[in-house]
Amino acid sequence: MQGLLDWVEKRLPAMNAYKKHLSEYPMPKNFNFWYLFGSLAMLVLVNQILTGIWLTMNYVPSGEGAFASVEYIMRDVEYGWLLRYMHSTGASAFFVVIYLHMFRGLIYGSYQKPRELLWIFGMLIFLVLMAEAFMGYLLPWGQMSYWGAQVIISLFGAIPVIGDDLTLWIRGDYIISGATLNRFFALHVIALPIVLLLLIVLHVLALHEVGSNNPDGIETKLPKGTMGDDYKTQFPFHKDYTKKYDIIDSIPFHPYGTVKDMVGVAGFLFLFCYVLFFNPEMGGYFLEPPNFEAANPLKTPEHIAPVWYFTPFYAVLRAVPDKLLGVVAMGASIVVLFLLPWFDRCKVRSYRYRSKLHLINIIQFTISFIALGVLGALPATPTYTLLAQIFSLGYFMFFVMLWFYSKNEATKPLPERVTFK
């Protein structure tokens, strides 16, 4: 058996790749709670792929059969209800862990040099994930699915010159119909998952090229030959590790990182299963009541709002009275996230060693983003619209203020070694 494994290893160095990118990957030893969400995102991705495959076996991608096929899955397919709820709950769980993953990058400066490309790959994953969720949202062919897609797709019509043609191309018809459903199904099941998986591979490769950031925002890599003896004393089981990697204050991902992540996975699965079995609709935020009615082009729901993970950007859109300018503002609210590495001109990464102004700016940005998420799910009354305008201003002011104060920001001295605050 060992001879066969050696033969395969010489032709396909899978074990070397496993050691380099997983078991012996150098992980800063002061990783904390905020460093769980990358692994959790991978776990949810596996859940979405597996449950999606099973749902596809019984789903009918046509205007006549889509809603009925979902009802069939829920009522007649053995454990079909469980698979459907695992997929719908998983979609929201995906965005929960992704938003927390992005927030960790924000507070610890994981977007700064030399990790700009790593951040961009992460933002591209977020963008594709939003497209994937939007395409999948139409597939149940319920009332909110239909009219939510109608509202979002119509926004492209506001783009000058190409707007009408672009809207027609996205829909595949002059109205949202079975042709739109077929198109979205193909993109949701085949095209976008391929792009998503490719971007995840690039994201991981970029991470392993520059190394992981840590809560202190300092590098753990040192010139060759400078590894301290304290590492061998603390982790005698990995004496050979120091011969391969000249990295101080780091530990192998396995078993230390895997054990840490397993604790997070256990906590996550507890919460996930609680929602799955006791509150899968989550009060209408995960699965809206109108979506249990078949799509009816002649009956508009009283209040149309996207799923919760789109509402912050939807609130920015509604905050601007002009349709075209609203689309521009919504697009800008996503584009500025891509440009974050160049807005922040400070040499210090982590908020721990930056000014109080920076901490206040992060807090007001977080409050603005959450408030926009709440307002985006509410009706567009004059009061809510005014609040959305105020919080939209706060959202964009984060980036403007960051660019101004970060250049000459008063920072605290950085530690020479990682700390365990």
What do the PLM-derived regions correspond to, one by one?
Residues 1-93, 97-421:
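Membrane-embedded and interfacial regions of multi-pass energy-transducing membrane proteins
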